[in-house]
Amino acid sequence: MFSLSATDLSLKIREGEYTPSEVVEKHIDRIESWNPKINAVAEKMFDQARLRAQEATLRLEKLKQGKIQNAELPKFFGVPFTVKEMLGVEGCRRTGGSIHRRHDVVDFNATVVQRVIEAGAIPLCTTNVPELGFWVESDNPIYGRTNNPYDLKRTAGGSSGGEGALVGSGASSFGLGSDIGGSVRMPASFCGVFAHKPTWKSVPLSGHFPRTPEELRGVSSETYSLTTLGFLAKRAADLWPLLETIKGPDDFDPETKKDFVLQPLIQDFTNVRVFFLSDPQLFFCRRASAEVKETVKRAALGLQGRGAIVEELDSKIFKNAVEIWGAATSSQGQAPFAERLSLGGTIDYFSEFMRLLVRKSNYTFPGLVTALLEKLPNLGSNFEKALCELKDIDRILQSKLGTNGVIIMPVYPSVAPRHRAPYLAPFDFVFSGIFNALGYPATAIPMGLNSKGLPLGIQVAAGPFQDHLCLSLAVEMEKLFGGWVEPKLPE
C-alpha cells in the first residue's frame, strides 16, 4: 500500500482491494509510528479523517451495488494526504510557526486544499514549518524541530519540511506545500521524494499564510508574493494529476492566470534540449559536492541515452542569485520581516538571544538574525541592478529553452545537512530560489541513495507554463533511477 502512487492506490480502492477506512487507518498507524522520531505533525485530524473515510467506504458500497458508476468517483478517491501548516485547513491552527499566532484557528480551506478534497482525497494532519516559513530547517517555538526520516540527526528541510518528512517516511501519499525559495523542492530532495513548484501565478494563493482568501482579493500585481503553491509525492505518476487538480483561477486570487493549459506528458525525448549545470558557481554559496555533481551528470547522461540533446550551461549564469532572489522578493512590497516576526510589536534582541541560550526565547535563531540583517544599511543599493540582471537572465534562458528545453541542476549543494549546519551556509537555498525569482516551473526528482543511505536528487526547470516538460522528465527519471527508496523506521 505505502509503495503505491496515489493514483494507483485510488484505483485499488475502486476495485475493492482496499476500503478507504482501511487505507486511512493504515496511514494513521504509520504516522503514529514515525512521528515520535521525526516530529513532522503540527495538528492531527484523525477523527475527521476517519469520518470522511467512512463516508467514502459507504460510497464504495453503492458502487458495488451498482447504484453509482465508477466514473463518478473522483481521481484521488479515498487517498489520504497531508497539508503544510501555512495552508488553511478548516478548524485547524494556521500559525506559520509564530508564537504570536499560536492560537490562530481558521474557518476556511485554502483553495488548493479544497480542490484536493473535492478530488476525493482525505486530509490526515497539518505539518511542521520554520518560523514564518523562512528557513531551510523546519523548527519553531510551537512545534519544535522536524527530523529527516533517513537520518534523525539531519534536517528534513524547509519550509515544507514536515511534508518532506511525512511523505519521505511513506506516511502520506502526497502533501501540499508552498515554495518561495525551494520550500517544496529542498524537503523533497532531502527526504527522497518528488516535488513540483508550478509556474508562478498558475495556482491560486488563496488561504495561504498570513492572509485570508478575502484579503487576497485586494492584492495588486506589485505586492503579489513570489510564493507558489505546490506539492510533494512519493511517485512521479501523481505530479501531473495533482497540478491539473490545483491549477487555475478561483474567486479570490486576482493574479492567477486563466489561460494556463497543462499539456500532456511527453514520452519521446528526441526533441528535448537539456542544459545541465552540475557545478553552479554562485556568490555566497558553497560549491556542489562531488556526489551532487555526479548525480546531475548521471541524470543528463540518462536523458541523452533516451535521445535528448544535451549540453552544458554556463556555470556562472546564476552567479548573483543571492542578490537577485533578495531583490525579487523585496520588490513584492511586504511588511518588514521584524514586524511580521513580532506581529507589530518590538523585539528586545539582546534579551531574546540570551533566552535562546536556555531555549526560552519566543523566536528562533534564524528568525532573529533575519530581522537584524534587515536593519543593516545599503542592503538595497544593488536592488535595481539585480532586477535588471534577472530580466537579462530570463531573456537568455527563454531564448535557449523555448518550448522544448529544460535545465538540470542541483536542488542544494549537498545532501541533507546536519541540524543547524545551514547557519554556516545560509544562502545555499538559492540553488532553488533562483527559479522562484524567474517564475519558472521546477521539479525535484529523487536519484537514489548515497553510500551513507541519504537521498540524492536533482531539479529540472523549464520555461514559464512548460510544467509538463518537468513532469515528463520526472516520470522518465523514475524509470531510469528508481525514484523513492523507502526508509527504515529508526529504533
Per-segment meaning from a language model:
Residues 127-128, 178, 410-412, 447-448:
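Short secondary-structure boundary segments
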Residues 138-142, 189-193, 322-330, 424-425, ...:
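Short low-complexity, flexible loop/linker segments enriched in glycine and/or proline
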Residues 33, 114, 118, 168-278, ...:
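Structural helix-boundary/capping segments
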Residues 134, 184-185, 213, 284-285, ...:
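Glycine/Thr-rich phosphate-binding loops of Rossmann-like dinucleotide-binding domains
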Residues 1-71, 245-430, 437, 465, ...:
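Amidase signature
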Residues 96-102, 421-425, 460:
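Short glycine-enriched, charge-decorated loop/helix-capping segments at active-site entrances
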Residues 1-181, 301, 306, 399:
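Gly/Ser-rich catalytic/binding loops embedded in alpha/beta enzyme cores
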